[in-house]
Design a protein with these regions (language model features):
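ATP-binding/phosphotransfer module of carbohydrate and carboxylate kinases, centering on a glycine-rich
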Residues: 1-68, 90, 95, 111-118, ...
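Phosphate-binding/catalytic loop of phosphoryl-transfer enzymes
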Residues: 78-174
Length: 302
């Protein structure tokens, strides 16, 4: 990491994920500053609070007295144009610079160096975004760990628990998946998993951190875990199908998120289902940090 000289004009891109936030400041001379912190305190459904959180992050990351030339943000759980616009207006008022706020999945296409395509995130949660020919944004999926986020870490754990409960109801002995979940949640038996999941105060984060249990169980031979992963991959592919049905160009599907990129079993399931459902779609794993897309969007404001 290099420090940006206080006098050098800079653009700031921010990727606010479900768990981690990455700010990147790029100076006119090419100097780059990276600042990473947790996303604790991010409240995207309160525009004033979200803007204040972002402004504090900018001041925390940049040298004292430095004002960026432009700021672009991709925010987790920024789900509608109206919501994003509210945060943008409040942030622009606080920083007095050009600002743009979009959902975090919208960072993927520009991060990949593309002008159009689909951005699909499967990290703690899952969501896919694209744009119609007139530039209007379209988002599908998401909805949080309780109702949706299929194929994301939290959704996989939820579905794994459901699979373990169903096996228990069929009278089956606990397999590697059930035993792994019991150990991870610190309970004594499968029926106690329900209370353990319901006691979470931060559902997405607390469920999602146990996703490695699902993949470990699959590697150990659990048919239940393998089915959960396969269904997760199909759910991710279904997000792309929904975008295509709504008129979004889905030739290029830029994929990011630790759940899908760090776990070949999930990525392979997604790619196989996508090839079957939308033969012309090309999955493209993102090989650079999504914050690069925010930097690109910030530059476009100048």
């Amino acid at each position: 990491m290099q420090d940006v000289p206080p006098s050098c004009p800079i653009v700031v891109g921010i990727d606010v994920g479900g768990t981690k936030t990455h700010l990147r400041a790029v100076a006119e001379d090419g100097t780059v500053t990276d600042h990473v912190r947790t996303s604790s305190g991010w409240r995207p459904h309160d525009p004033e609070a979200a803007a204040a959180w972002l402004a504090a992050l900018v001041h925390e990351a940049l040298p004292a007295g430095t004002r960026p030339s432009a700021v672009a943000v991709g925010g987790h759980a920024c789900e509608t144009p109206r919501q994003c616009a509210g945060i943008r207006l409040a942030l622009r008022e606080l920083l007095d610079v050009p600002a743009l706020v979009v959902g975090d999945a919208e960072l993927l296409v520009p991060a990949a160096g593309l002008d159009k395509g689909v951005g699909l995130v499967a990290g703690t949660g899952s969501v896919a975004v694209g744009r119609l020919s007139d530039g209007s944004p379209v988002q599908v999926g998401g909805w949080g760990a309780v109702l949706g986020d299929e194929g994301g870490s939290a959704g996989l754990v939820r579905e794994a628990a459901r699979a373990a409960w169903a096996a228990h109801d069929r009278g089956e002995d606990p397999d590697e998946l059930a035993l792994g979940l019991i150990a991870a949640f610190g309970v004594s038996e499968v029926p106690a998993l329900g209370a353990a999941l319901e006691s979470a105060t931060d559902v997405s984060a607390e469920w999602g951190r146990h996703a490695p249990v699902v993949f470990a169980a699959a590697a150990a031979g659990s048919a239940l875990a393998r089915q959960v992963i396969a269904e997760g991959g199909r759910s991710l592919a279904a997000l792309v199908v929904r975008l295509a049905q709504r008129g979004v160009a889905v030739d290029d599907v830029v994929v990011a998120g630790t759940a899908v990129l760090a776990q070949p079993a999930l990525y392979d399931a997604f790619a196989a289902w996508l090839a079957e459902a939308v033969p012309g779609a090309r999955p493209r794993p993102l090989r650079v940090p999504p914050v690069e897309g925010a930097v690109s969007l910030a530059r476009s404001l100048l």
